[in-house]
């Protein structure tokens, strides 16, 4: 019967997404994911020794040790760590353990930009191992000692990874995508570690139902509190004037700034106005081909501010960054996204503070939740 077919790759059983060719069923939900698969016979080529030029904080060391013990016992883990806590470092010890046993290690994340940014960090931590990145237009080589990849590429690795780390499980497009979630599950033959600054109740329930454990880290590695957002309730004209004044102030103080917008259209309009009054800025979004070039110019202080969509809510770390969120009451800004955006500020040990300003016509439930959660994290870390 038609409705009994279950796709072996993405587990789809919905008749609406099942087609038939010559009487044989096929899945339309994941048919677009086509390409060669990784060779499971690959063996580690280099020396899997972890090398860190900096010490972990006491809290990081404790979590890292707990993760390792869980991985040794075959147990899965969800790490709930605040933005800037140093989540990536928490899995290095476990990666080293699996690699020394000759196992396959993967580090997946929803966004290509984050994969690219991870390459030098992982290569520095494991300098004697080969590290590759696999994403949309970069998939000619699939095997290496450590594989960094977008979650879209996990279908190439069925029952492959002895340890699979999935970063940013709360991020688009992984969040709520059953096909990508199935690819993740299918690629595991050992243990997995999930990383998130804003896991949902569903995420926590699923890991516990899977007999896994939830580990929490509410303290940043530099022991300073998370910058807590301030809400300014203003209508559009007043909002734009406020942003211009703040950008001019930050430029005088030599403070780089992200100005977040909910949509590309609003971002283009806002930047066209800001650019008349404040120089040395640019607009970036998922549609901008020059995005990575503009980000590098921003890091080099050629640009003093970037107007950006949520594309920069993760992955980019800049010293002394200030954060402004315009139209913070827009329905596209949920509490999870606002927490991530606020987490861009104060990440560097030599600049652990920064302003986070939400501007909107009113205080929404999502704004209140974000402000409340960030305050709660600081309380739990004992920093208030």
What are the language-model segments listed below?
Residues 129-143, 283-309:
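Conserved helicase ATPase core of P-loop NTP-dependent helicases/translocases
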Residues 159-163, 168-231, 242-245:
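Post-DEXD/H (motif II) to motif III coupling segment of the RecA-like Helicase ATP-binding lobe
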Residues 189-202, 344-371:
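Conserved segment of the helicase C-terminal RecA-like domain
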């Amino acid at each position: 019967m038609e409705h009994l077919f279950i796709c072996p790759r993405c587990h789809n059983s919905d008749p609406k997404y099942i087609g038939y060719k010559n009487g044989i069923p096929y899945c339309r939900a994941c048919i677009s994911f086509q390409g060669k698969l990784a060779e499971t016979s690959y063996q580690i080529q280099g020396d899997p020794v972890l090398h860190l030029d900096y010490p972990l904080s006491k809290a990081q060391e404790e979590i890292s040790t707990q993760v390792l013990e869980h991985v040794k016992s075959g147990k899965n883990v969800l790490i709930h760590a605040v933005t800037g806590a140093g989540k990536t470092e928490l899995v290095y010890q476990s990666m080293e353990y699996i690699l020394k046993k000759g196992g396959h290690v993967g580090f997946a994340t929803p966004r290509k930009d984050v994969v690219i940014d991870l390459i030098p960090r992982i290569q520095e931590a494991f300098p004697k191992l080969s590290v590759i990145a696999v994403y949309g237009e970069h998939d000619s080589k699939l095997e290496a000692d450590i594989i960094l990849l977008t979650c879209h590429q996990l279908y190439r690795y069925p029952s492959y990874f002895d340890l699979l780390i999935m970063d940013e499980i709360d991020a688009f497009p992984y969040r709520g995508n059953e096909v990508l979630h199935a690819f993740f599950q299918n690629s595991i033959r050992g243990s997995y570690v999930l990383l998130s600054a804003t896991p949902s109740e569903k995420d926590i329930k699923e890991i516990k139902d899977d007999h896994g454990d939830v580990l929490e880290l509410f303290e940043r590695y530099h022991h300073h509190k998370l910058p807590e957002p301030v809400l300014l309730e203003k209508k559009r004209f007043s909002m734009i004037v406020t942003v211009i004044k703040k950008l001019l102030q930050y430029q005088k103080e030599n403070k780089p700034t992200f100005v977040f917008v909910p949509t590309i259209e609003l971002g283009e309009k806002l930047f066209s106005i800001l650019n008349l009054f404040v120089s040395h800025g640019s607009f970036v979004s998922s549609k901008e081909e020059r995005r990575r070039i503009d980000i590098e110019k921003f890091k080099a202080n050629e640009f003093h501010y970037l107007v950006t969509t949520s594309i920069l809510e993760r992955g980019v770390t800049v010293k002394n960054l200030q954060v402004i969120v315009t139209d913070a009451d827009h329905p596209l800004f949920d509490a999870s996204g606002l927490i991530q955006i606020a987490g861009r500020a104060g990440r560097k040990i030599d600049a652990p503070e920064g302003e986070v300003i939400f501007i909107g016509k009113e205080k929404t439930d999502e704004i209140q939740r974000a402000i409340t959660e960030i305050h709660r994290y600081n309380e739990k870390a004992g920093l208030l």
